[in-house]
Swiss-Prot record:
PANTHER family: PEPTIDYL-TRNA HYDROLASE (PTHR17224:SF1)
Protein name, entry field: Peptidyl-tRNA hydrolase
Classification of source organism: Bacteria, Pseudomonadati, Pseudomonadota, Betaproteobacteria, Burkholderiales
Job of this protein: Hydrolyzes ribosome-free peptidyl-tRNAs (with 1 or more amino acids incorporated), which drop off the ribosome during protein synthesis, or as a result of ribosome stalling.
Record-marked site positions (Stabilizes the basic form of H active site to accept a proton): D93
Length: 201
């Protein structure tokens, strides 16, 4: 069963629409669905709401520590409520999936994602759930003929808003993720993965 859903992103209006904030977009939607208001909670270093989702009590969290210190926020809440790593779902932007793709998985490395890296370090575990929201990779913007030796600027890419056609398919992917959230929250993760990954994710 999932007791804590974390959306990753950077605080501040200048980052709201950027690719790196895709995790915030999902948690914002969940809060809206639950009629919950995310409020600044200093002891958890983030915006927090206790929500009633699909008949279960779920904690929603958007760390406000900047991405590379997200673990500080997650571990503060997890310790306070005695939530285990495998009861946590972290929604985050994923460079290795194209816009419009979304995948659910348990554990694994950080894939170069500084937010995941910090969460794993603070939890002393990689065994938490991840919802990987595809944003594409800047190398995909470079013509194949010019890719040899090119060094895509990943940092700049994730801190820019998606193009409109990308945003549309990312929004659709988030909607597909929301459709399987009842199963995820209730711990029916195999069913959720089958449904999510079958639906063109």
């Amino acid at each position: 069963m999932i007791k804590l859903i974390v959306g990753l992103g950077n605080p501040g209006a200048e980052y709201t629409a950027t690719r790196h904030n895709a995790g915030f977009w999902l948690v914002d939607q969940l809060a809206r669905e639950a009629g919950a208001t995310l409020r600044d909670e200093r002891r958890f270093h983030g915006f927090y709401a206790k929500a009633r989702l699909y008949g279960e009590e779920v904690h929603l969290l958007e760390p406000q520590t900047y991405m590379n210190r997200s673990g500080q926020s997650v571990v503060a809440l997890a310790h306070f409520f005695k939530i285990l790593p495998n009861e946590i779902l972290v929604a985050h932007d994923e460079l290795d999936l194209p816009p419009g793709a979304v995948k659910l998985k348990l554990g694994g490395g950080s894939g170069g994602h500084n937010g995941l890296k910090d969460i794993s370090a603070h939890l002393s575990s990689q065994q938490y759930w991840r919802l990987r929201i595809g944003i594409g990779h800047p190398r995909d913007m470079i013509p194949e003929s010019a890719r040899a030796g090119a060094k895509p600027d990943v940092a700049n890419f994730v801190l820019k808003p998606p193009r409109k056609e990308e945003q549309d398919v990312i929004d659709a992917a988030i909607e597909r993720a929301l459709a399987v959230m009842p199963a995820v929250v209730k711990g029916e993760t195999e069913r959720a993965m089958m449904q999510l990954h079958r639906n063109g994710a």
